[in-house]
Each structure stands twice: as C-alpha cells, then as structure tokens.
Amino acid sequence: MASPASPRARVRALLQGQGDGRGIAVPQAHRLAARIQERDWDEFSCDPTQLANGLRDLADAINPDGVAVCLPDVLLEGGRDILTSEQGQAALEATRRLKASMGERVALVACLPGPSLLDSGIDGLLEAGKAFLAAGVHALVILGDDADDGPSVSLSTLANIARFHQAPTVGVPASLGLPAVELVPFDAPHPASGLVLTETHLPRETDVSELEDWVDTVRG
C-alpha cells in the first residue's frame, strides 16, 4: 500500500487540480501557540525564536496539515508596512527556521492581508508574497476585505510567481479573483476540501483538544 501523501505534496497537487478532495487543515492559532509556550503575546509575536518554537509546539499538539506562519491581524499590529515591522521580520525568520526543521511534515502557509489594508496597496502585497515565498512557504492565502474590490494584474503576477515556487495562491473575498480558501467556524466544523482555515484567529484560551477535533473534522 502506498504511503499517504505528505501535507506538502497535497498542497502542491492543488496547483494541478489534483487535490484528494479532503481538507488541508490550517488553524489560525498564533495566540494559542503563545500560550503553549507560556509567552507574553507582545514578545512572542515579535521574536522569531519564540514564534518558530510556538508554532512547532502547536503542530506537535494538534497535528494539523498546515501551519500559518503569519496572520493578517498579527502582521498589522506592527503597522501597514508589514515587511518592515517587527512582526513581519519575525514571521519571515520563523518561516526559514520551520522550513529547515519540519520538512514535509506540515505545509507552511503565509496568510496575508488584502491590498486595501497595506500602505503600498497591491505593490506591498506583491512584495510581501515574494518575501514569504523566498523564505519557504508552500502556499499563500490572501485574506482581504470588502474594500478589495477587484482582481488586478499584480495579483495574477503574484499567483504566477507562487506557481513557479510550486505554491498555490488562494483568497477571499471572491472579488480578488483568486481560487477560494474555505473558512470553517471553530465551533461548527464540517468536512471540507482544499485549503481550510479557521474562520477567525482563535483566542489564547482555546482548548487544544477541541482544536484537534476541528482539524480531524475538516480533514474528513
């Protein structure tokens, strides 16, 4: 019997439309990771060592298919120029370390804010996406808002660059013109397919066993 495909291989298969029909579970859970590490949030989010260790411990605890190396709300805590902030720099370095230490065990996913939330707009998003791809992420997720009112050439450029790295680019809302990522509520999980995130960034006090159940359910 063939061995099950690794999370990295499952993500890569999405590029060819050859997904296995099961969910690739990626919880938004940095605050929980900080609690697992027993770290203060402000230090955790700006320290690449704490961030990498916390996300690795989170993966050990809940066995997800993917780890979100950055989240929009966390990146924006440092301002709208996300690559120059302490949070952005910490996330990039943590990505490099996780890439080296975790191999194919989990897919590394960069969840980035939509262009309307960034000082440099679409150009800022393009540069951020390129930086995280160079650091080693396996997928990009753009979590925009209603102000992101249409697809652009730059988003197509970003998706093409990501494809060169064998990384899919997905996002919400649909107006971004990207393949959709599924957002599943933590308190109402259901089997899903493709890349699947918790609907929101989970609070620090989230129960680890309940999150493990969420992962198992959306994976199907």
Question: Where do the protein language model's features map onto the residues?
Answer:
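N-terminal basic, low-complexity leaders that serve as flexible interaction/assembly modules and, when applicable
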Residues: 1-75, 155-168, 190-220
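Active-site mouth loops of central-metabolism enzymes
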Residues: 37-51, 109, 117-127, 181-188
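Active-site-adjacent beta->alpha loops and helix N-cap segments on the catalytic face
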Residues: 90-96, 148-156
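A cross-domain feature marking catalytic cores of carbohydrate-active enzymes
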Residues: 27-29, 71, 110-114, 144, ...
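Alpha/beta enzyme core
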Residues: 120-142, 147, 155-160, 164
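Active-site-proximal, glycine-rich beta->alpha crossover segments in alpha/beta enzymes
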Residues: 53, 76-135
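Glycine-rich, proline-tolerant flexible connector loops at the mouths of alpha/beta enzymes
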Residues: 66-87, 136-152
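Short beta-strand/loop segments at the ligand-binding rim of alpha/beta enzyme cores
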Residues: 102-108, 160-181
